[in-house]
């Protein structure tokens, strides 16, 4: 009789994986609630579309590979992938975009590598980057937060815009994106980058409606604080470790502070970097993915710091206003190298 030796890991704990994924899904509730509050019902519709698409895509691949569909879907990883992608895209993006991004994330970025535990890149961020590169206009068409919006779509209008491109009264995305100053709005990070390139001073930019009276932009600072609250709860539940979020946020804050001190007229202040865009979502929910992050404590600190540095560089000097997704994927590439040089020394072995 011939015994085959399978590749590691040799022990699997389906219940533990399912529990951690469920905790992460529960921790996302404050962030989702904040996005619903400031950006409307479109976020919920996108989550539903992404969740159904993720489950169907994963079930299809598992069926083709003749693996147990029910047992694998119970680990909740497909749901989490769909959720993370859905909250990362504009709430009123066309329905086919979130479906396309989710299917690509699950089938190409996850199952093509062998499924959960085998993928080297974060599937949700792969899906996001594919959409961003392919459809940059739709992926950057965020609504203004309700506090500065002229037109606030209801639940029915949100569904109609997502599936047809227009509200019941005939309004389109250009109408819905108008702010109280009559100007089409963008995210705080996008507004800052575009305005600096147009020659506006930071002092002028901070007087815009999206920044006026705010630390880091209307709506967005509260969304980030909500994701932070969910992340702290994950730490308390010991579902994630502190190394990656802390090193990521400290590095981002340090780089932003130094940059702002040296060039206050062209670079954003640290609070804008920390409380705008996908900062807290990335720190606690994306970078901490146990499959694609470093596996040693020292490695996690390096991994988080590298991602923080990359986010600041992309936001400050790159072509995209946020940069979290690109930073995550670039950091994922370095994980084997980081783990190799930070692996703990075996007891009894002398140092190289």
UniProtKB/Swiss-Prot annotation:
The chain crosses the membrane at residues 20-40, 42-62, 89-109, 123-143, 215-235, 242-262, 267-287, 301-321, 322-342. InterPro entries: NqrB/RnfD, RnfD_bac. The keyword Magnesium does not apply. It holds the Pfam family NQR2_RnfD_RnfE. It is found in: Cell inner membrane. GO terms for biological process: electron transport chain; transmembrane transport. Its main location: membrane. The modification FMN phosphoryl threonine is found at residue 187. Its cofactor is FMN. It is an enzyme of class 7 (translocase). Disulfide bonds: none annotated. Keywords: Cell inner membrane, Cell membrane, Electron transport, Flavoprotein, FMN, Membrane, Phosphoprotein, Translocase, Transmembrane, Transmembrane helix, Transport. It is a multi-pass membrane protein. Its EC number is 7.-.-.-. Coiled coil: none annotated. The keyword Transport applies. GO terms for cellular component: plasma membrane. Part of a membrane-bound complex that couples electron transfer with translocation of ions across the membrane. Required to maintain the reduced state of SoxR. Belongs to the NqrB/RnfD family. The complex is composed of six subunits: RsxA, RsxB, RsxC, RsxD, RsxE and RsxG. This is Ion-translocating oxidoreductase complex subunit D. It comes from Escherichia coli O7:K1 (strain IAI39 / ExPEC). The lineage of its organism: Bacteria, Pseudomonadati, Pseudomonadota, Gammaproteobacteria, Enterobacterales.
């Amino acid at each position: 009789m011939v015994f085959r030796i399978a590749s590691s890991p040799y022990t699997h704990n389906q219940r533990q994986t399912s529990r951690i994924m469920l905790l992460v899904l529960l921790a996302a509730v404050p962030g989702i609630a904040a996005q619903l509050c400031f950006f409307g019902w479109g976020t919920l519709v996108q989550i539903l579309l992404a969740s159904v698409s993720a489950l169907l895509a994963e079930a299809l691949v598992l069926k083709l590979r003749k693996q147990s569909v029910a047992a694998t879907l119970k680990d909740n990883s497909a749901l989490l992938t769909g959720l993370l992608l859905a909250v990362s895209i504009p709430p009123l993006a066309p329905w086919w975009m979130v479906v396309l991004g989710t299917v690509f994330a699950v089938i190409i970025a996850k199952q093509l590598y062998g499924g959960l535990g085998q993928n080297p890149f974060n599937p949700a961020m792969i899906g996001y980057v594919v959409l961003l590169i392919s459809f940059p206009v739709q992926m950057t068409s965020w609504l203004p937060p309700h506090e500065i919006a002229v037109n606030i779509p209801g639940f029915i209008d949100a569904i109609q815009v997502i599936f047809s491109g227009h509200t019941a009264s005939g309004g389109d995305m250009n109408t819905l994106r108008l702010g109280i100053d009559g100007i089409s709005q963008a995210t705080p990070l996008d507004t800052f980058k575009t305005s600096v390139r147009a020659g506006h001073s930071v002092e002028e930019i901070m007087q815009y409606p999206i920044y006026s009276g705010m630390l880091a932009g209307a709506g967005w600072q509260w969304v980030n604080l909500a994701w932070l609250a969910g992340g702290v709860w994950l730490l308390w539940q010991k579902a994630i470790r502190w190394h990656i979020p802390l090193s990521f946020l400290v590095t981002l804050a340090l780089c932003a502070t130094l940059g702002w001190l040296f060039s206050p007229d062209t670079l954003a202040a640290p609070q804008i970097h920390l409380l705008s865009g996908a900062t807290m979502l990335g720190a606690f929910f994306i970078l901490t993915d146990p499959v694609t992050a470093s596996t040693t404590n020292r490695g996690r600190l390096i991994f988080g710091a590298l991602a923080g540095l990359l986010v600041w560089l992309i936001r400050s000097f790159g072509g995209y206003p946020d940069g979290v997704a690109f930073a995550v994927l670039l950091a994922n590439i370095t994980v084997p190298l980081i783990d190799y040089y930070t692996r703990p020394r075996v007891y009894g072995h002398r140092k190289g």
